[in-house]
Every structure is written in C-alpha cells, then in structure tokens.
UniProtKB/Swiss-Prot annotation:
Pfam families: Methyltransf_9
Binding site residues for carboxy-S-adenosyl-L-methionine: K90, W104, K109, G129, D151, P152, T153, I180, E181, M195, Y199, R314
Gene behind the chain: cmoB
Family: Belongs to the class I-like SAM-binding methyltransferase superfamily. CmoB family.
Subunit structure and binding partners: Homotetramer.
Protein name per the record: tRNA U34 carboxymethyltransferase
Keyword Transferase: yes
Enzyme nomenclature, EC number: 2.5.1.-
Length: 321
C-alpha cells in the first residue's frame, strides 16, 4: 500500500502544514473505500525493481536512463509490470529505454501552456485532476519547489508511484488521492493548475471558487478546458454524451469562461491559447486497449463529434487571485 507519511513530514514545516489537520484522517478513510483492484495495483508498484538512474531529464521529457543499459530480461519485466497498470492515458514516459506511449501526447499540451506561465522556479504548485502525474514531473523540471497533484482515481496513483520509483524516488512531486472538494481552503499554492477538469463538473463556478481558495494572494491559475465557438452567452450543455463521455456538463465559449472567472473574483483573466485536439495528440497505442479520439468523432466529418457537436477544442486561460 502507498505510504503517505513521507509527504506529511515534507509539509509539516511549510505553508501546507494546516492540511495536516484534516488530510491524514481523510486518507485513512480513503484506504477503507478503495477500488477492488487497488491492492493488486499497489503490489505491482512494489514488484518494480529499485533501479538507480544515472540520467534523469524532466525539462524536455519525463525520462530516466543509466549508462549501462538494462538486460532484455530486466526490460521485459518492467514492461510486464507497467502493462498491468493499463490503460496509460497521459504521457509519454521514457524509462530506462522503455517508451510508455500513452493515449495522450501530454507534451503537446505542455508545450502550448509553458511559454505563457509565470516562472515555476521555487513555486509550490497544486495540479487538480493530475491523472498519473505527467505534467507534475514537467513542473518539477521547470524548478518547482514542490508539486502536489490531487486525483481520486486509484489507478492513477499507482501509475504515478510506479513512475516515481523509476525516477530515483523523487519526492518533489506527490499525488494525493482526493478531489478538490475534499480539500480545506489552504490559500498556500503559488500556482494552481486545473487542466481537463472543468467540463466534468456539475457546478463549474463552484470549481473555480475552490481553485481560488487554494491560491495565495496574487497567485496564478492555469485553467485548460474544452470550449466551443460563440459569444459571452454561449455555453454547450450536451443532451446526453459528448464525444462518448457521459460526465460532460458545461462547455463554454472563451468569452463565457472569462466571464465566469471574473464573476468568482479572479483578476487579469486572459486567454493565451486555443487549439483543436488532433488525432496526433490523442490516439490509440499499445498502452491503451480502449477507444480514443478517432472513435469519438463523426467518421464522415472530423469537425464534429459522433453526436454532432463541435469537435473538441481546448483553451488555456490564465488568471490571478
């Protein structure tokens, strides 16, 4: 089972220390309600060899390697363990010569977001809905002091811990298996990321307020989410599914999204990037047995989802508390 005590020790003397009033009890309760496969997944993490990497690159990729290559047997054992943690959705990872080719080329998103950010050097960062943590490692690569990701999905936690083990057990990033609605308002993070989360929320303004509550005064929000074309009054509310996803509730235009952010009290709100999701960025691989973007689009018109809505387009919005 994953041991969170090192994280408690890490934050005990930081601005996050108030979290210790609630977090240990929440995680004890979480352990009693975990997914039926969690014990199996966490054992897979334990089975991974403690390999020492001579080279780690988190600046241009998430990559570890050593001067003497793994034997083919060692490499196949690691691949076997990592494939037991499928599906791998966000990546890619390059670990001791093994290319974990995930469904999403999350490096594409990072390349769109990074040029617009306030420097991450020395910052304490919260990544909401962090998945298996790919972007967290890239934040560490930009010099972040501490990155905390929150995501309630147990598989993502085990994937994150598996990658951590193959990155010399780097403790600068930590994944906590909770949702933001379970976090007390800490007002302690210099930067808060919420990427690919807002459209899954039944109450998007509540989500934006929760993000604001975690930021220090003047801190930076990085919001990345689905948008549709239209004016300040345009919001798509899918009748049933959107791109085969059941849990999509509100997809605003950029103008409407900026209005929402200003309404909950953010300042200096600006859109810095808009990009249509491509079949190069989201696709099937050997590390994902499920459907992917090609299956979610109208086969005769890729500008539409299979339900007839505008195809996925994503905006990056920055704002300050």
């Amino acid at each position: 089972m994953i041991d969170f005590r090192p994280f408690y020790q890490q934050i005990a003397t930081t601005n996050l220390s108030d979290w210790l009033e609630t977090l240990p009890l929440q995680l004890k309760e979480w352990e009693t309600q975990t997914h039926g496969d969690y014990a199996k997944w966490s054992k897979i993490v334990d089975f991974l060899s403690d390999l020492h990497a001579d080279e780690i690159d988190l600046k241009s990729a998430v990559k570890s390697d050593r001067t003497s290559p793994l034997s083919e047997g060692e490499k196949q054992r690691i691949i076997h363990h990592l494939k037991q943690l499928m599906p791998w959705r966000k990546g890619p990872y390059h670990l001791f010569g093994i290319h974990v080719d995930c469904e999403w080329r999350s490096d594409f998103k990072w390349d769109r977001v990074l040029p617009h950010l306030s420097p991450l050097q020395g910052r304490t960062i919260l990544d909401v809905g962090c998945g298996s943590g790919y972007h967290m490692w890239r934040m560490v690569g930009e010099g972040a002091k501490m990155v905390v990701g929150i995501d309630p999905t147990e598989l993502f936690l085990c994937q994150f811990e598996a990658v951590r083990k193959l990155l010399n057990n780097d403790r600068r990033a930590n994944l906590i298996p909770l949702g933001i609605e379970q976090m007390q308002p800490l007002a302690a993070f210099d930067t808060v990321f919420s990427m690919g989360v807002l459209y899954h929320r039944k109450s998007p303004l509540d989500h934006l307020s929760q993000l604001k509550n975690q930021l220090v005064k003047g801190g930076e929000l990085v919001l990345e989410t689905l948008v549709v074309d239209g004016d300040v009054n345009t919001v798509l509310i899918p009748a049933d599914r959107y791109a085969k996803m059941k849990n999509v509730y509100f997809i605003p235009s950029v103008a409407a999204l900026i209005n929402w952010l200003e309404k909950v009290g953010f300042t200096n709100v600006r859109c810095v990037d808009v990009a249509t999701t491509t079949l190069e960025e989201q696709r099937k691989t050997d590390w994902l047995e499920n459907e992917s973007l090609i299956d979610f689009l109208d086969p005769n018109d890729h500008s539409k989802t299979i339900e007839g809505y505008q195809a996925p387009k994503r905006a990056v919005i920055l704002a300050n508390k």
